[in-house]
């Protein structure tokens, strides 16, 4: 064999590999790439299987041996509830709302505006991610409550101060619920509206429209202020849940008319029911924000507001003013239609609403009232209890001879047209200027009033100190004091109620607050008719009585004039409040000449303890000597009158017309049997046989006269002095 041939045969494969080396390299590269891809796929699948097998809460990232938790977006960090309260209602609502917010696992803080400094802390809410809720009440004359006074003052000044600007609170989120009474129509929920407006002017974002609670059960959208708040609270919690999830949508561009647009028509079910249609207007904001419902203010509105903020040509001013007037007319028409509908005062079943709400029933029951039907009540006077024990009667016993243990204190109307600062009923009674509630029949009211009164008397059976004969007498009602609470003359069937009293041989003592002159003129004869004369000037009357009527002074004077034509016994009741109405002697004298009452009761105000609804303190209570001095000075100005009686225990004196002083003796007491005979003759003659106060007067005993050693205390009874004096909780 040829050696050269063998060499070629051995080198041929190597030469072939060399020649095809490119393809070999390519094959190796492809193989390695495939291997790498397979490894990546295997590892990825294994990781996915591992993640599925581990709970989601434990899927943390490991970095250099440390656990790094995934951060979650927080859209709402908490809720701050600010309240401004006078009687405690707003504070109670704040507590209820806080409980609802807590159920969402959100931190919540309740803050009294009296203890909050907006100058230092309000700006913090811009970046805090909190939702701020303001529960604010409207108090006298549309002003804020004492606790919210400084906050509102600061907020108003900041809203109009150019140094703060329109973006000062940009980023702050808020909601407002106002508490008010639509009976005060001119400033209903004014504070809530203002707080809402001022926050918006400073750039804060409203998360939902303003809620409005109404104490007037007739006009309240849901039947009571508590129900109004519950409805608003439900919507707020729903809105808060949406904010927690970070749900967002484009806000309205602000060009919609009357606050209506397609986006909000779809969500109309969520629109706040507590605000009026004329208060629904969307403010321009081009940013992407949380879902919200907006309400408008009368001062700002849509395109008009935008155009007024920019430069306006003089010739365009006329068009703008015409447009503003047109909007105002449309608003008034909507308010009128809304008012006509709301004045019907019907509940969901179409029935006329009752005056007594569940919350009012609870409050009055705690105060010892026995409620009757839907608008009446009866309560046992402390003087009734006193006379059952033989410890003396009230000043009516001293002045007019009533038997205090046989006197039933009641009212057919818990509602009143005033909010007197010295009212000892704790300002829980409803207010109104006319009857708009469901009405009970007088027969039922009288029947249940007597039954409830007798049941309260029965509780004293066997009580130590109670005299058996007086207990038996007390079971038969002989007198009715229509002075418990409210304005009894508002009750549409008051005349029928009085006739029923007289048919039962029960004398009638009716007290009115001098705001219903027509009703006084149309009133049937009563045993004794009182008019409360709490002040002698327009300003002081407004300050003390806080009346609902705008023309309260004219009504007051007309009521006194109506009293002058009454033939039966009439009385002015003056309540002296030191530093408020004790320096108006000449004005009081003029009022006396206007009504020519038979008697004038002058009584020092009774301090009934601290009340958030009144600024009255012990410093306003005059000493008995001061009351005596006032009466002496007043008598000097009214020559036809003299001081007749005194009841030192009640801090009260009686001024009587001289016609009741016969033969040097006073005849201020009442012959009750004679009155019943006269009223029966009056009824039998259909009112033609009239009678006067002198026809049923009786001689006043010596111990009741002014200057007597007894100082008005009946010597038949035993004077009792408590070891620990406590505040009076009720009285005539």
From Swiss-Prot:
Cofactors, names only: [4Fe-4S] cluster
Record field: compositional bias (Acidic residues): 287-299
Alphabetical list of CDD domains matching this protein: Radical_SAM
Domain Radical SAM core intervals: 400-644
Keyword flag Nucleotide-binding: yes
Alphabetically ordered keywords of this record: 4Fe-4S, Iron, Iron-sulfur, Lyase, Metal-binding, Nucleotide-binding, S-adenosyl-L-methionine, tRNA processing
Protein name: S-adenosyl-L-methionine-dependent tRNA 4-demethylwyosine synthase TYW1
Native organism: Pongo abelii
Gene: TYW1
């Amino acid at each position: 064999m040829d050696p050269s041939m063998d060499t070629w045969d051995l080198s041929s494969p190597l030469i072939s590999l060399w020649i095809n080396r490119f393809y070999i390299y390519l094959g190796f590269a492809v193989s390695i790439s495939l291997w790498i891809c397979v490894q990546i796929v295997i590892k990825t699948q294994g990781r996915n299987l591992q993640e599925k097998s581990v709970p989601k809460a434990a899927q943390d990232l490991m970095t250099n041996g440390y656990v790094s938790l995934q951060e979650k977006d927080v859209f709402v960090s908490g809720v701050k509830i600010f309240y401004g309260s006078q009687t405690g209602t707003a504070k109670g609502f704040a507590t209820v709302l806080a409980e609802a917010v807590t159920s969402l696992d959100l931190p919540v803080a309740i803050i009294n505006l009296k203890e909050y400094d907006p100058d230092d802390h309000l700006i913090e809410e811009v970046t805090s991610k909190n939702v701020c809720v303001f529960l604010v009440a409207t108090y006298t004359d549309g002003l804020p409550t004492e606790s919210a006074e400084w906050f509102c003052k600061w907020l108003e000044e900041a809203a109009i101060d150019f140094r703060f600007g329109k973006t000062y609170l940009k980023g702050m989120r808020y909601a407002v619920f106002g508490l008010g009474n639509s009976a005060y129509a001119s400033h209903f929920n004014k504070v809530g509206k203002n707080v809402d407006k001022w926050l918006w002017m400073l750039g804060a974002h409203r998360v939902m429209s303003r809620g409005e609670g109404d104490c007037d059960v007739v006009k309240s959208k849901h039947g009571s202020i508590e129900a109004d708040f519950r409805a608003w609270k439900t919507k707020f919690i729903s809105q808060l849940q949406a904010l927690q999830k970070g749900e967002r949508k484009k806000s309205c561009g602000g060009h919609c008319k009357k606050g209506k647009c397609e986006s909000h028509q779809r969500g109309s079910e969520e629109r706040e029911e507590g605000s009026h249609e004329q208060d629904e207007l969307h403010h321009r904001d081009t940013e992407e924000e949380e879902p919200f419902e907006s309400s408008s203010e009368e001062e700002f509105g849509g395109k008009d507001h935008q155009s007024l903020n920019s430069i306006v040509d003089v010739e365009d001013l006329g068009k703008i003013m015409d447009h503003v007037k047109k909007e105002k007319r449309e608003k008034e028409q909507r308010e009128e239609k809304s008012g006509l509908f709301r004045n019907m005062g019907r509940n969901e079943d179409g029935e006329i609403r009752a005056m007594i709400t569940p919350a009012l029933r609870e409050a009055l029951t705690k105060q010892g009232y026995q409620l009757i039907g839907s608008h009446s009540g009866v309560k046992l006077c402390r003087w009734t209890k006193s006379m059952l024990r033989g410890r003396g009667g009230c000043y009516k016993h001293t002045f007019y001879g009533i038997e205090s243990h046989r006197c039933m204190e009641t009212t057919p109307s818990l509602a009143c047209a005033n909010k007197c600062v010295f009212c000892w009923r704790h300002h829980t009674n409803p207010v109104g200027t006319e009857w708009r509630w469901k009405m009970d029949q007088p027969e039922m009211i009288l029947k249940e009033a007597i039954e409830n009164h007798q049941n309260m008397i029965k509780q004293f059976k066997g009580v130590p100190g109670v005299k058996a004969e007086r207990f038996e007498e007390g079971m038969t009602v002989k007198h009715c004091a229509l002075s418990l609470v409210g304005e009894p003359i508002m009750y549409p069937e008051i005349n029928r109620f009085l006739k029923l009293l007289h048919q039962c041989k029960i004398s009638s003592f009716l007290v009115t607050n001098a705001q219903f002159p027509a009703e006084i003129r149309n009133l049937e004869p009563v045993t004794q008719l009182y008019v409360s004369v709490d002040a002698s000037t327009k300003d002081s009357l407004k300050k003390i009585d806080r009346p609902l009527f705008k023309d309260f002074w004219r009504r007051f004077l007309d009521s006194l004039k109506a009293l002058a034509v009454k033939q039966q016994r009439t009385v002015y009741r003056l309540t002296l409040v030191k530093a408020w109405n004790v320096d108006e002697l000449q004005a009081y004298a003029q009022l006396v000449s206007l009504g020519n009452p038979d008697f004038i009761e002058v009584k020092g105000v009774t301090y009934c303890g601290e009340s958030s609804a009144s600024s009255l303190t012990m410093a306003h209570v005059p000493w008995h000597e001061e009351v005596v001095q006032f009466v002496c000075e007043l008598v000097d100005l009214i020559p036809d009158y003299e001081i007749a009686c005194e009841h030192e225990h009640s801090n009260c004196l009686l001024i009587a017309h001289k016609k009741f002083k016969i033969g040097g003796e006073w005849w201020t007491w009442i012959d009750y049997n004679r009155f019943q005979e006269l009223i029966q003759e009056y009824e039998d003659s259909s009112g033609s046989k009239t009678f006067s106060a002198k026809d049923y007067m009786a001689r006043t005993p010596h111990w009741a006269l002014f200057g007597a050693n007894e100082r008005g205390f009946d010597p038949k009874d035993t004077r009792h002095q408590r070891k620990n004096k406590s505040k009076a909780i009720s009285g005539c």
